[in-house]
């Protein structure tokens, strides 16, 4: 049985007097695919901002890999990332330069960075683009770098 990597329970958020989302419940299993769909103003961005800890919920709980995001945000955020449709990349960098930069600003120990970069590139299918400038990759491969 696969673990729940993200679990949302009774999630609600209120902007002053209006509820943006109310009593949202869902779970995403490890290696799962999940679509958050809805019309404009349905609360998709609010929900994602709460899951990414950009916004604090009014009610309910978010668990990342079993860790309560509200109670232990630093530990929980180690297990999640968010990639917007248009990734904010430094396109003048090579893939390796960018991945090193990202690991460095996340304060990963320098001796662990090269191995982590290789794992990430292999997992995303971009190993053969290591020395290529990001601007010279297709949109799909740029998303993988992000």
Model-derived segments and spans:
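ABC transporter nucleotide-binding domains
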Residues: 3-6, 13-146
């Amino acid at each position: 049985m696969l673990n729940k990597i993200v679990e949302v329970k009774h999630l609600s958020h209120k902007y002053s007097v209006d509820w943006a989302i109310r009593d949202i419940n869902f779970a995403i299993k490890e290696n799962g695919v999940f679509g958050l769909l809805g019309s404009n103003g349905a609360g998709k961005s609010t929900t994602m901002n709460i899951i990414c800890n950009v916004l604090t919920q009014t009610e309910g709980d978010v668990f990342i890999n079993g860790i309560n995001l509200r109670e232990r945000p630093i530990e929980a955020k180690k297990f999640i990332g968010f990639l917007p449709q248009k990734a904010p990349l430094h396109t003048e960098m090579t893939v390796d330069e960018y991945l090193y930069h990202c690991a460095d600003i996340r304060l990963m120990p320098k001796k662990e960075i090269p191995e982590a970069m290789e794992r990430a590139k292999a997992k995303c299918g971009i190993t053969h683009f290591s020395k290529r400038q990001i601007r010279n990759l297709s949109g799909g491969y740029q998303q993988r770098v992000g």
